[in-house]
Amino acid sequence: MANVVVVGAQWGDEGKGKITDLLSEKAHVVVRYQGGVNAGHTVVVGGQIFKLHLIPSGILYPDKRCIIASGTVIDPEVLLAEIDQLHQLGISTHNLYIAETAHVTLPYHRVIDVAEEERRGIYRLGTTGRGIGPTYADKAERMGIRVVDLMYPDQLRERLSWAIPYKNVLLEKIYNLPPLDPEPIIEQYLAYAERLRPYVTDAALLLTQAIEERQNILFEGAQGTLLDLDYGTYPYVTSSHPIAGGACVGAGIGPTSIDRVIGVAKAYTTRVGEGPFPTELKDEIGAYLGAAGAEFGTTTGRQRRCGWFDGVIGRYAVRINGLDCLAITKLDVLDGLDEIKVCVAYEYQGREIRHFPSDARVFAQCKPIYETLPGWKCSTKDCRSLEDLPPEAYDYLKFLAQLMQVPIAIVSLGASRDQTIIVEDPIHGPKRALLYPNGRKQVHALMPD
């Protein structure tokens, strides 16, 4: 195989869970490298639905080691509930490992997250309210609680006995909320610690050993490129780094250890929460996409905003992540449409721009410039090869590959594993340098000309 990073090429919810699940079959180790319970993956196997927030999708394979790495933030209550749910479904978690250096979400993080969002009023960010941002803020301020702290009761009690009164000052003085009682929280997290103890390890060392043994490692990102703290639609972003470079810091590996980067994008675009969205559809087509695609968040249940495919942010994701290939998901949601539009550029103050603007104020004023392609009336759900696709669907994929200037390796046509077209092996297929030996020579049906 190789060491492969799977990233979202849009605003998250692209279907990374299914793609990671498919690729996990060839991996020895699957790593979740950033984010927390603000992300959710849905995997369907044999008609059984698995909804995961923290545990890597590879857990469904008993012979794969699954690591929750240092770049994540862990809510013990949610993590233990996931473990219990998997056990109830007959899935073992003997192959789960938790980085001792990952930071821990505490009750005051969740309270502050919700209170701060309410305080922002019309300037709210649309957070999940799960305490992710405040947990990462404590990490940056060097006052966070790490998983390793849970392993030492006296140390945990000492740290929380200082941290909770400090947070109570914020709750009372800034948010006008009642203080939290330290003792129940301390006892609760001591109990969590005992249940988590068998899973806790030096994850970075474990990965180093796997790399030295030339094992195949799959790095699974949460959220998407446009939610990256540095390179997303700031301030409407998450508090971590979902981009491919985030795998190095979050997992504790060097950049030379990464062999390939696979981007996942829907055949249209969705976004949850606040922030600019140039191709958003607020008409009956947007409602159709939302209904046909079951566009409700795994974590919050919030309805996702829907729009046409945005090639501008797509090209940006290719550049920022150095994508080698793409997996296009939910192509079947477009079944039945008379025509399909794709954003190829933006209009801003009377001029055309083809790059993603880093200034949110500029981005908010961008209007999409579309190219219109014919739709198709038949279902694609049962297609298992490119030849099975209606010509219009094939041409649509070809157009996206040309627009993004990166090959499409996987096409997903439903939630189940078997509802997939493997166009080219995304792991063992040719690298970017081999795809374009003479400029942009076409070497595959779904590679750009």
Curated annotation (Swiss-Prot):
<dbReference type="InterPro" id="IPR001114">
    <property type="entry name" value="Adenylosuccinate_synthetase"/>
</dbReference>
<dbReference type="InterPro" id="IPR027417">
    <property type="entry name" value="P-loop_NTPase"/>
</dbReference>
<dbReference type="GO" id="GO:0046040">
    <property type="term" value="P:IMP metabolic process"/>
</dbReference>
<feature type="binding site">
    <location>
        <position position="142"/>
    </location>
    <ligand>
        <name>IMP</name>
    </ligand>
</feature>
<feature type="binding site" description="in other chain">
    <location>
        <position position="128"/>
    </location>
    <ligand>
        <name>IMP</name>
    </ligand>
</feature>
<keyword id="KW-0963">Cytoplasm</keyword>
<dbReference type="GO" id="GO:0004019">
    <property type="term" value="F:adenylosuccinate synthase activity"/>
</dbReference>
<feature type="binding site" description="in other chain">
    <location>
        <position position="302"/>
    </location>
    <ligand>
        <name>IMP</name>
    </ligand>
</feature>
<comment type="pathway">
    <text>Purine metabolism; AMP biosynthesis via de novo pathway; AMP from IMP: step 1/2.</text>
</comment>
<feature type="binding site">
    <location>
        <begin position="12"/>
        <end position="18"/>
    </location>
    <ligand>
        <name>GTP</name>
    </ligand>
</feature>
<keyword id="KW-0658">Purine biosynthesis</keyword>
<protein>
    <recommendedName>
        <fullName>Adenylosuccinate synthetase</fullName>
        <ecNumber>6.3.4.4</ecNumber>
    </recommendedName>
</protein>
<comment type="similarity">
    <text>Belongs to the adenylosuccinate synthetase family.</text>
</comment>
<feature type="binding site" description="in other chain">
    <location>
        <begin position="38"/>
        <end position="41"/>
    </location>
    <ligand>
        <name>IMP</name>
    </ligand>
</feature>
<feature type="binding site">
    <location>
        <begin position="412"/>
        <end position="414"/>
    </location>
    <ligand>
        <name>GTP</name>
    </ligand>
</feature>
<dbReference type="GO" id="GO:0044208">
    <property type="term" value="P:'de novo' AMP biosynthetic process"/>
</dbReference>
<feature type="active site" description="Proton acceptor">
    <location>
        <position position="13"/>
    </location>
</feature>
<feature type="binding site" description="in other chain">
    <location>
        <begin position="13"/>
        <end position="16"/>
    </location>
    <ligand>
        <name>IMP</name>
    </ligand>
</feature>
<feature type="binding site">
    <location>
        <begin position="40"/>
        <end position="42"/>
    </location>
    <ligand>
        <name>GTP</name>
    </ligand>
</feature>
<keyword id="KW-0479">Metal-binding</keyword>
<comment type="subunit">
    <text>Homodimer.</text>
</comment>
<dbReference type="GO" id="GO:0005525">
    <property type="term" value="F:GTP binding"/>
</dbReference>
<dbReference type="InterPro" id="IPR042111">
    <property type="entry name" value="Adenylosuccinate_synth_dom3"/>
</dbReference>
<dbReference type="GO" id="GO:0005737">
    <property type="term" value="C:cytoplasm"/>
</dbReference>
<feature type="binding site">
    <location>
        <begin position="330"/>
        <end position="332"/>
    </location>
    <ligand>
        <name>GTP</name>
    </ligand>
</feature>
<keyword id="KW-0547">Nucleotide-binding</keyword>
<comment type="function">
    <text>Plays an important role in the de novo pathway of purine nucleotide biosynthesis. Catalyzes the first committed step in the biosynthesis of AMP from IMP.</text>
</comment>
<dbReference type="InterPro" id="IPR018220">
    <property type="entry name" value="Adenylosuccin_syn_GTP-bd"/>
</dbReference>
<keyword id="KW-0460">Magnesium</keyword>
<feature type="binding site" description="in other chain">
    <location>
        <position position="238"/>
    </location>
    <ligand>
        <name>IMP</name>
    </ligand>
</feature>
<dbReference type="InterPro" id="IPR042109">
    <property type="entry name" value="Adenylosuccinate_synth_dom1"/>
</dbReference>
<feature type="binding site">
    <location>
        <position position="304"/>
    </location>
    <ligand>
        <name>GTP</name>
    </ligand>
</feature>
<dbReference type="Pfam" id="PF00709">
    <property type="entry name" value="Adenylsucc_synt"/>
</dbReference>
<dbReference type="InterPro" id="IPR042110">
    <property type="entry name" value="Adenylosuccinate_synth_dom2"/>
</dbReference>
<feature type="active site" description="Proton donor">
    <location>
        <position position="41"/>
    </location>
</feature>
<feature type="binding site">
    <location>
        <position position="40"/>
    </location>
    <ligand>
        <name>Mg(2+)</name>
    </ligand>
</feature>
<keyword id="KW-0436">Ligase</keyword>
<feature type="binding site">
    <location>
        <position position="13"/>
    </location>
    <ligand>
        <name>Mg(2+)</name>
    </ligand>
</feature>
<keyword id="KW-0342">GTP-binding</keyword>
<dbReference type="InterPro" id="IPR033128">
    <property type="entry name" value="Adenylosuccin_syn_Lys_AS"/>
</dbReference>
<feature type="binding site" description="in other chain">
    <location>
        <position position="223"/>
    </location>
    <ligand>
        <name>IMP</name>
    </ligand>
</feature>
<dbReference type="GO" id="GO:0000287">
    <property type="term" value="F:magnesium ion binding"/>
</dbReference>
